[in-house]
Amino acid sequence: MNRMLSLSVQSQRAPASPSPYGLKIDKRVSPDYARAGVRS
């Protein structure tokens, strides 16, 4: 759970992310990461 939280925070702070959840990053990491972003 802690890892998911840190990942979501990183995606929001990512300056090179086209979307608020960093679709490019979540795709690189894993599909679960995208779910966490959409949930939060």
From Swiss-Prot:
Residues 1-25 are annotated as: Disordered. This is Uncharacterized protein TP_0041. Residues 1-14 have a biased composition (Polar residues). It comes from Treponema pallidum (strain Nichols).
